[in-house]
Amino acid sequence: MGGPLMWALLLPLLLHQAGSQTSSCSVLSGYMDWTKEYFDTCLNFSGKILTQLPQNQSLRARSVQLLDLSANGLQRLPWSFFRDLEQLQLLIVTNNSLDFVDRALXXXGCGLELLADCSCALLDWHTDRQDNCSGPELPRCLDVPTGAWHNLSVFLDVSCPSGLTKIAIGALAASGSLLLVLAIAGPVLAWRFCRHRMDQNLSKTWASQDGSRSGSGRQPRYSSQGRRPKSPANTPPRSSTPDYENVFVGPPAARHQWDELRSPPSEGGDFYMTYDSLQHESQPVYCNLQSLSQVPLDDEEYVVPGR
């Protein structure tokens, strides 16, 4: 009990000392040259509007113990930039909109104290620090609106219960916006699609009706089988030679041929059949009448093209 209580009492003093050290570090002027080697134990790069740290090299300052990167608009803290800072004890990155803190910083050493704004971006770093460090230290974070320091663990438990970072929160917000757009636009798109399908079906129906009307104008083709007297019961069986009759495919203009050969059959017993060819040419069609011995022999057939 004594250790944590003493640490809680000493932490404000340490923060005050850190602030005193920071104030004693003058801000470096001029252009930032990351290839330059620094031999100072305290480096103050605050307010330099760096926005981004080098991704492929470390700061050349092996003796630095306090590094102030506050108020720069930084969003990422890559491990590669701090890799060679073996003496670093205090890293100040307040007043930056961080959305990524490399969790490898927690493995750099339990003696490194990180001062940052309260943010869910600290979750991975804090988790690894708790796993690797068992000291009585209580990491703190700065509440920017009030300027007060809070327990980082409590803040993460309350504000980031599911481990949401800014990137995850942004992704969820974007997904919600997309679902909202789909919910609004979905019924409209479905209505337009159904209307388009109905218009297509209606057009096909009209086209089929027009085709049937135009097809009805084609000339029918006729076949006739003359009326013959019924043979008596004792009539000998018919010859095995099949009977054929010409069927003329063409316009019914040759009606007078019926008048010369035979009188037209009565309408009550007529049957009609049409033979439809793709070339619409008149040509004789032969059919075997032997299979029609069971039906009256005076039938005529008429078929309308297209039916």
Curated annotation (Swiss-Prot):
Domain of life: Eukaryota
Residue numbers of Phosphotyrosine PTMs: 286
Keyword Ligase: no
Oligomeric and partner information: Interacts with RIGI. Interacts with SQSTM1. Interacts with p65/RELA; this interaction promotes the degradation of RELA through autophagy.
Signal peptide boundaries: 1-20
Residue segments, region Disordered: 205-249
Biased composition (Low complexity): 211-226
Bias (Polar residues): 232-243
Keywords from the UniProt entry: Cytoplasm, Glycoprotein, Leucine-rich repeat, Membrane, Phosphoprotein, Repeat, Signal, Transmembrane, Transmembrane helix
Protein name: Leucine-rich repeat-containing protein 25
Sugar attachment sites: 44, 56, 95, 132, 151
GO cellular component: cytoplasm; membrane
Residues in compartment: Extracellular: 21-168
This protein's encoding gene: LRRC25
Source taxonomy: Eukaryota, Metazoa, Chordata, Craniata, Vertebrata
Residue stretches of each LRR repeat: 63-86, 87-110
Location(s), subcellular: Membrane; Cytoplasm
Transmembrane segments: 169-189
UniProt topology in membrane: Single-pass type I membrane protein
Cytoplasmic topology ranges: 190-307
